[in-house]
């Protein structure tokens, strides 16, 4: 166990730190908006996404990572050969009609559970690091530039 409480080496501590810093940037941007602004379509245009849809999307990926990390820890993990586009469509549909509060709570809970599973791994490996990056820092990076622009646009309308 490292001084920071992580059972992993430096590369893995870096993965957690990257996840943390990007998550807090993302959430800081979201908190700059009113609940009504979070429901405004336009974050993406085709298909039309709101910030609620973005948080629902991120939250479902975090929840999926939690499941995969559980399987890694239990020795039942079968690899990450998956159809990302199909999962994105499935996750978007699952969260599409959820209220803002549900999408927000689900994203925060998904992240918390994913991190709990990460820290509970008895034998962390490259697959675990792949999931923490795919669902966390790397995934947030895919969305942060557009979110910054969209938040600036929404705030500018006030």
Give the ranges of each region predicted by the language model.
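Short, contiguous alpha-helical
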Residues: 2, 40-86, 119-158
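Amphipathic, well-ordered alpha-helical segments in soluble domains
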Residues: 22-29, 61, 110-113, 117, ...
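Sparse, context-dependent recognition of short Cys/His-centered cofactor- or disulfide-binding micro-motifs
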Residues: 4, 18, 23, 34, ...
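Hydrophobic packing residues in well-ordered alpha-helices of helical domains and bundles
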Residues: 16-23, 51, 100-107, 133-136, ...
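Acidic/histidine-rich alpha-helical segments that form the ligand environment
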Residues: 87-127
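Extended aliphatic helical segments
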Residues: 13, 30, 51, 102-105, ...
